[in-house]
């Protein structure tokens, strides 16, 4: 195995500021528009691209609702108007989740959201249209990630409380 010589040194103040600002930028949001008309349909994957749905109809998904089933897939749809105040700005979809969600906006894949990524940049893919139609497919694990905690070992199911989805500018 090759060894890499590590040079230990202090960071210059500029480097430290750049590093910290990069961390802080993740939490600075200029405009935050809630996406209200979200609907969801829960399913269980039977085989590849074959799902058994728990209901034939989509149900509304509101802030504070439980969503996802243990080891389940959810199909989520939403549509929102882009106000004039957000036109010609860099738009992002912001959604906190413990699941893995792939996102389409106006029919184009724009990226994914997961516990490590809570937003997706939209503008390079769809510009700034008058309306944005979202289609999302998410997968939720059947147990928490932290297996060191004896209490979480007995828990089967990572149901989540929906905290809302937002159209934001940064």
What name fits each language-model region?
Residues 2-27, 31-38, 46, 136-170:
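An acidic-aromatic loop/edge-strand motif
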Residues 35-53, 100-107:
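Extended low-complexity, serine/threonine- and proline-enriched intrinsically disordered segments
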Residues 58-64:
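Short Pro/Gly-enriched beta-strand edge/turn motifs at strand-loop
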Residues 81-83, 96, 137-139:
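Solvent-exposed residues in well-ordered beta-strands and their adjoining turns
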Residues 85-105, 114:
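Aromatic-lined ligand-binding clefts that engage carbohydrates, nucleic acids, or primary amines
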Residues 102-150:
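Beta-strand-rich ligand-recognition modules
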């Amino acid at each position: 195995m090759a060894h890499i010589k590590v040079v230990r040194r202090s960071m210059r103040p500029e480097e430290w500021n750049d590093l910290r600002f990069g961390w802080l930028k993740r939490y600075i949001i200029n405009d935050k528009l809630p996406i209200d008309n979200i609907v969801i349909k829960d399913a269980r994957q039977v085989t590849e691209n074959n799902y058994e749905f728990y209901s034939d109809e989509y149900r509304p998904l509101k802030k504070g609702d439980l969503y996802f089933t243990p080891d389940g897939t959810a199909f989520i749809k939403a549509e929102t108007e882009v106000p004039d105040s957000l036109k010609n700005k860099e738009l992002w979809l912001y959604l906190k989740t413990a699941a893995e969600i792939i996102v389409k906006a106006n029919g184009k894949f724009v990226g994914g959201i997961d516990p490590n990524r809570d937003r997706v940049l939209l503008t390079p893919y769809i510009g700034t249209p008058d309306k944005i139609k979202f289609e999302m497919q998410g997968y939720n694990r059947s147990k928490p990630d932290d297996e060191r905690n004896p209490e979480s070992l007995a828990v089967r199911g990572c149901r989540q409380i929906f905290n809302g989805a937002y159209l934001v500018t940064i």
